[in-house]
Amino acid sequence: MNEWSEMLVCRDYCALMMRDRKECDARCCRDGEGERVRARERLDATVAGLTELEYLRQRQELLVRSVLSCPEAAGQDKPCLTVDDSYLNTEEKLLEENILLLRKQLNCLRRRDAGLINQLQELDRQISDLRLDTETSHEHVETDSRPSSGFYDLSDGASGSLSNSSNSVFSECLSSCRSTTCLCTPLDTSLCASEGRLKPADDPGSCAECDCHCEDSSSGTVRRSLSASYSPSPDSSCDGISKFHCDLIAKNGNDVYRYPSPLHAVAVQSPIFIQSMTSHLKDDCNFSKPGEALNDEQKPEQVVGSQTSSWHASQMLPNKKLDSYIYGLLQRRAQPLRTNKPRTSINTDPSKSILRQASLCSRAPASVQAQQWTSDLKPNWQTCLQDASATSTEPSTASPQRQWSAESKGGTPQNGAYLSSSQPQNSYSTTNENTNCLLKKKVSGTSKGQLLSATPKDCPDLGSPKAVSSPKLNKHCFYNVEDNKTGQAMKASPLKRSPKTQTSLSCGKDSEQLAQELVSLGSSSQSQDEGGPLVSAQYIPAQKQNVNLQKGGTKNIKIVKVKNSASSKSRPQVFEHVSETVRDKHRTGSRRTRQVDEVHHLHKSSKKASAKTKRIPASIPEGRILERHTSSSGARSSAQRHHGHHRHHEAVLAKPKYKRNDFHRRPRGLHEIPYEEAYRRAHRRQKREMLSHMYLPSNAHYTSPYAYVGSDSEYSAECASLFHSTILDTSEDERSNYTTNCFGDSESSASEADYVAESSTSSDSEGSAGVNWRQISQAGSGSHGMTSAQAKAFVKIKASHNLKKKILRFRSGSLKLMTTV
């Protein structure tokens, strides 16, 4: 038993050992196989890498050899380039072929379009030649006054020929009837044909049905609907006939044919479009007034084959005829006057409507032109006149303004406006005549009641806001007049001017008067200085001109040379006295007007005209400055300078010569300064003039010719007007050695000899005292030929120290200024 059991145990053990060995062998085999697979893969990768390296080596070898052997390289590169070029050429050829094909297709489409258009035109001609079969309504046609039952051919403008033209959509004019018959629309006849008869022309319902299209040539009256009881205006001349001018919409609503279209000639008659057109027009009628159903409820024509078709619009025919007849009766009784503006209009082409009813709206263009002229005139002329009349304080200025307003409405724009003259020429008892408002200056002028012959280009609209803002554009009106003016004309007084001279200078004078009024608005009394100083000049006769000028007791002495007069005419001696009360009164308003004046002085080059007006006798109003000083710089010849030392009656306050030469610069725009500001400044100026008249002789008039300044230099705008009221002009003798233009005015090179002689010291004095400035003229100078009999004068100038500092800051290069506090 034991042995048997041991044998069994040994067998089991052996079996287990065998099994374990097999498993171990199997595991070893699996592991070895996996390792073999991995080794094979590694070897394959290595071989592949070696192959790639070999390929790269061979390729590199080929490249090196190709580079080393040039003939071989050329032979090898050429085929490559040829291949590339052939590829590109193939693409280009394909593109070119495609382009050519597209062009051919486009040309074919164009030819097809042209063929379609030709076919449509041919169809249109054939339709025009068609005749209706009117046997069913033959008896009605015999009673008709028309020779046949056809339609009027509207495409033949006003010819009155009869045909059944369904192409009336292309008609441009409404034909006149040959007799007292009505021109019924093709729609009316087609509707009647569907009922079995043709409408006679004398049928009241027929007339009322188409009363928008009726025209009675014998009586000259036109029967219209109640809603259209007015002559047609250009934008609603014939709403009824405009039914064919609408866009065509298909039943499905997808296809829309804009008018005008070649399809209108045929498609408008097709039933495909009738329903949509009718509903479209009915929708429009729902929004219009009841009386306008006649105008808007117009329906397109029908083809002969579709005349017997019943469509829902014919159901409304009895009611529509009744309403139309009632409206027609009311229209014949009374036509209330109404403006030429329609209530509604479905007309999309007003120009064609004008042509259609040209006989009914013949007066419309005239009314439109009148409205345009009135609307253009009122804002420019009348508004400014009303604003100016509001600023007036005396009745004497309101009358000519109203007169000018009335005359300007009736005047023609080609000839300008009639100018009324109520301004006294010599008497200045009413200061408003010269100082109140700008428009008074422009109205009065120098031509008393004379009609300006200048065109609107040469003499711009004086009433416009541009004209009262700045005299820039007005300058060109008198440039040429200045150059051609002689000394004889300058000597003549304003009252003794010849009519020829007045005519030639009228535009220039009015422009200069406007410019001078604007010049005066920024006068020295309206100080831009922060302290509000006033510069006053007093003329003292019978004094020696050659005098040394001193500032204080210890200041350097400076010689100031004064330029001689530019003309040899003798003027009455006048003394101007400006009181301290005037100075104090206007000092208070200086700060208030500084901003306006700064805007006024920003446009510096537009203000050169004031430089020409520096020597003005006090008896001449500022509006006359141009008449006295219209000679150009070329007119200042040596002969005129020879007699130019009559300085006792002239204001010597002047700008430098090189600034005055800038007078001939190009004029600029007139839109910078609003005319309300100009009117306010004119009002302030009027107050100053009224106060100054209390201290002036009856025949004297205080002028401030340098209240208005212009230059291109960068001197301060705040002290610009006062600066030109305090500087002395330079002399024109051989000693004037100041030849440099410190502000770069290239136009002043011709007058460099006129600059002031520069002193070696400046006058930036802090404690300057009162100084009398005397005019230094070279007595006995051969170049001037001064005689002892000529009058002597000197000017006493007072200005604040603050103003002096500002002037010297910007002007120290051309003059030395001595001021007193």
From Swiss-Prot:
Q: Which domain of life is it from?
A: Eukaryota
Q: Just give the chief location class.
A: cytoplasm
Q: Does the keyword Coiled coil apply?
A: yes
**Gene Ontology biological-process entries:** negative regulation of canonical Wnt signaling pathway; negative regulation of JNK cascade; regulation of Wnt signaling pathway, planar cell polarity pathway; Wnt signaling pathway
Cellular location(s) = Cytoplasm
Q: Which residues form a coiled coil?
A: 88-136
Q: Point out the signal peptide segment.
A: none
Q: What are the boundaries of the region Disordered? A: 288-312, 386-432, 564-615, 627-655
Motif PDZ-binding in this chain: 818-821
The terms describing its cellular component in GO are: cytoplasm
Biased composition (Low complexity) is annotated at 388-400
- Regarding domains, what does the record say? The C-terminal PDZ-binding motif may mediate interaction with the PDZ domains of DSH (Dishevelled) family proteins.
Q: How does it assemble?
A: Interacts with dvl2.
What does the sequence similarity comment in the record state about its family?
Answer: Belongs to the dapper family.
Record protein name field: Dapper homolog 1
Species assigned in the record: Danio rerio
Gene assigned in the entry: dact1
